[in-house]
Amino acid sequence: MIDEPGGHREVVLTHPRSPTERAILQSWAEEHHPGARVLPVWAGTEVPSALGEVLATADDGARDTVIVPARVTWVTPESDEPGAVRRLRGLAVTAAMRMAWSPLHPAMAHYRPDAARVVAGEQATVADLVSRFVAQAGGGPGSTGFARFVARQAVLACDRAERKVLGDRYKVPRRMVEQITSSSRFAALVERLAGETGSPAAEISRRLRSCLHEMAAVQSPPAIDVFRAMMGPMHQKTWDVVVDESGLERLRELNRQHALVFLPSHRSYVDPLLFAEVLHDRDFPRNHVLGGNNLSFWPMGALGRRAGVVFIRRSFGSDTVYKAAIQEYLGHLLAKRFNLEWYIEGGRSRTGKLRRPRVGLLRYLAGALAERPGLDAVLVPVSIVYDQLHEVGAMAAEQRGGEKRAEGLGWMYGYFRDQRRHIGTARVRFAEPIPLRRALDEAGDGPAQLEKVAFRVCAGINRVTPATATSLVTFALLSARDRALTLQQVREVVAPLADHLEAREVPVPVAELRTRHGLRMTLDRLAEAGVVTIFDGGTEPVFSISPGRHHVAAFYRNGALHHLLLRALLELALLRVGDSGEGEDLVEVAWRELSRLRDLLKFEFFFSTRREFRDEILRELDLVEPRWRERATSPGDVRAALRRAPLLVAPGVLRSFVDAQLVVADRLAALGEDPVPAEQEFLTSCLGVGRQMLLQHRLDRADSVSRELYGGALRLAENRGLIMESDGLGERRRAWLGEVTAVIDDLGRLGDLQRARLEVVLGTGEEPAPVRTDVEGDSDVAS
């Protein structure tokens, strides 16, 4: 060490992995820090005693000694080029240079001397490092952990410097478990858990360390490149990807101050792979993706963990230590500003619309913030939507009662094979970011706090989810009720849907819906997937949903239903207003009906607050009848407004869900006062009864025979107190059945009007007749 002109001394702390790197670093130090002492900390070895000796002099007044971290970074040919590593040769070169295998260093330095770059981390005095160590670990410069702490800080400083060369996409955590377990927070956590559980502190410490090692992702640039190259075939050829670039740039600015928690919708196994590639290509740091350990089989588990996947046990019951480990790990990641990602629905949607959110991980995230008052995280709702998915057929089979195939190597091979065919576009869009602390405050205290935050995330996803051509075309064909339509007839059915969505400022693919060529391409893709049948043996081709493929078509249709939900509810409410007697308050009738429908469907769709819901309904009414305040003064006026409306969507939007409720309500009513069997047994019986009722034409929609829809109806029944034994249970079950039957009757009346419209489109009918008014006993649906 030498004294600098400013009176301080310098120590260059290097991290060589080979004699070649040591020579490069020594030469660099002599040029840039002449006379400074160079201390190598070899990878995988203990901190050298010489560093401890240097730091020990801090007690003798040498705290102005400056530590200069430095290491060699091998820059690959692809470092400045975004995009996946696609060729095996490129992968081999990139992986070799990223791994920087020490036996290759002499050859790499000889043939590619420009590839070896020395990166120097931010310098710090020993005094600064002592202050940090005291704050984080509670020790002093003389403690045994101080030298390890300094070496760890040097590694992190070099990581930050390296990212300026390689880009933010290779921001990777280092020694996370060691950082967590060496902190004063960890010691306090062990003491608290020992007191709560009555277990010895040593046992708690061992279990916590084991849990942290089990879940912690150990990212490395070589593993990331290998993982991307291996997983690329699962999505690269399948879709063209369209990204909300402006939304992502806003997030980049936010990420400079806060960790981001990406919460995407979940439709496919490839969601995290495709989303990771979107971020990688735009030089975003790689997310820590929290996923179930059902996907941790070889080689996914080994590679995934090194590429940022955090495998969480799918169930851990009352394991207090494991829960504490998750919370501590998440909090540490946020504190270090590493971004997170998980899928708030808890699994892939089997119906095509957002599932009810799971709040378990959100609870641990909120707990981590509560323990760190100066920390915040920003939730980012993300919509990932596909024109088509190869895996929809398998998910549809599960809903009809089929078994889910277990994930493994055989499953992966089949998935790779299926993904080789191009099937359209994937769209990634970002909703308004939500600061978590503010969201928790606005949700208020109480047991529903986290659920309100999760619903807010889901509402954000729905708002930015575009309506795809596939969703609107399948909506039109399913609404035709197994009738085949010509291309022009499909256009005429789709046009009012597209008009309505554009009036609501919902993104719609104009080129695919407004032109014959675009619409035909959409139908041809659906035909290639077996969803649509094309018959061209007559005067012109006609299109219909293929037999047995209604669940698949409904999956695509359901992706746009949230944009049509308010319209559907309003149509039903107006129908009831049209049934009102003279002298009734029409506005009161409408709001009463809307409130009832909202409660009936609250486990299937996401609704805004009641005040916001009222404003949304009024805006929707302006689209249905712009002069409703002047013209809707009597029930007859309202019935006339329904006849004039260019679009009726309620049967297409709601019938499947209400049909599913009918099956569950019918089974509960049949039980009388008896208890409900175990959930899975009950749902299986509903599948059988649902198939029977469909064959008897007591149900209108084949896609209503669905385990997931029956599950939603069962949650509603539980919410209404129709599961557990109580006074008047049988009567209340029958009352719910009557309520559902009445809604089905209303949908049937609107369906009559809708079918009359379709006959006009087909050229086989006249203008719709007046709306059929409600007459007691009019329903043709047996209970």
PLM features per residue range, with description:
Residues 1-783:
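Membrane-interfacial terminal anchoring regions of lipid-handling membrane enzymes
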